[in-house]
Amino acid sequence: MEGSGEHGETSKGPLSKGVSRGLCILDLIFRVIAVIGTLASAIAMGTTNQTMPFFTQFVQFKERYSDLPTLTFFVVANSIASAYLIISLPLSIVHIIRSRAKYSRLILIFFDVAMLALVTAAASAGAAIVYLAHNGNVSANWFAICQQFDSFCERISGSLIGSFAAMVVLILLILLSAVALARR
Amino acid sequence: MEGSGEHGETSKGPLSKGVSRGLCILDLIFRVIAVIGTLASAIAMGTTNQTMPFFTQFVQFKERYSDLPTLTFFVVANSIASAYLIISLPLSIVHIIRSRAKYSRLILIFFDVAMLALVTAAASAGAAIVYLAHNGNVSANWFAICQQFDSFCERISGSLIGSFAAMVVLILLILLSAVALARR
């Protein structure tokens, strides 16, 4: 609010402008972290499969991520989020230079919120399935498959981390954009 | 940006001010819808149980929502979101009167985003479990329990609707707040 009596780029003091630029650079860093998180999750999950070695050549037990539809959704959602985040990087760089942009920030908030919902949905649906794989469920007669497929289970559990990290970073990104809008 | 040369409540034209007030009233309406959605979901899921009538008095098959930990999380998350949304209603009313508020809007965005993550997580984890209950999974040897517990399954499927609706409304709420911040 202070010094908002003028139009244009020069309406804020140098300190305030520096803080605004700092927020924009933080935005860029967070976006890169989120790209890494979602991409790592998608790749780690997408390359997961385990074949049981001790069965005959006729009956082979093999578990792939695509046997569980929820894990397929996890891979697709994380890939989409990662692609969007890479596309949004140039816009984030533009914001560092033009820190008073309004409409482009609103567009970024819109898509960031949508991607937050997508990544959160993927991460938590994945977590629900991974939990079942580890613990099973007595009343529904679903057995824990992790006793047979231990490396498969470790892998799908690990790939959740990147997705949950991306979720937290996306929340911070939305808040950063909101603060930047409020400071204009 | 237009007419931003003055401080205080009177800096915008009457039309622009009317639009701002309209956005705030929309915010209030959306919040009420989200309260109804999350509350209905929590209650519908929280009261779900089914006892199979055709078993003996010694062995009774009963399925309750709390047998599946994910569904318990669903109830808790929707209750928390619904409680937060009710608490946020007065602040939303204050925004109708004082449409240039900045910090209270930022606080609302912060909690709205957190609640969006919570509701999305609950809805999608619930959906993953409901999908399994309906379809089972061949490779993991998880059987579809909906063949035995049909009314249980209908109930838990139905209670997802309110949660997903609340998710969409929360996304719109965050966007409304962002637009309101940008229009200040």
UniProtKB/Swiss-Prot annotation, chains A, B:
Cellular component (GO) terms are: plasma membrane
Q: Which residues lie on this side of the membrane: Cytoplasmic?
A: 1-22, 94-105, 181-184
Q: Which UniProt keywords apply?
A: Cell membrane, Cell wall biogenesis/degradation, Glycoprotein, Membrane, Transmembrane, Transmembrane helix
Broad class of the protein's primary localization: membrane
Positions of transmembrane segments: 23-43, 73-93, 106-126, 160-180
Against InterPro entries, the record matches this protein to:
CASP/CASPL, CASP_dom, CASPL
- Locations listed in the record: Cell membrane
Keyword Membrane in annotation: yes
- In terms of superkingdom, the source organism counts as Eukaryota
Q: Which residue stretches are annotated as topological domain Extracellular?
A: 44-72, 127-159
Membrane topology listed for this record: Multi-pass membrane protein
Q: Which GO terms describe its biological process?
A: cell wall organization
Question: What Pfam families does the database record attribute to this sequence?
Answer: CASP_dom
PANTHER family linked to this entry: CASP-LIKE PROTEIN, CASP-LIKE PROTEIN 1U1
* Assembly and oligomerization: Homodimer and heterodimers.
**Family from the record:** Belongs to the Casparian strip membrane proteins (CASP) family.
Q: What does this protein do?
A: Regulates membrane-cell wall junctions and localized cell wall deposition. Required for establishment of the Casparian strip membrane domain (CSD) and the subsequent formation of Casparian strips, a cell wall modification of the root endodermis that determines an apoplastic barrier between the intraorganismal apoplasm and the extraorganismal apoplasm and prevents lateral diffusion.
Q: Which protein is depicted?
A: Casparian strip membrane protein 3
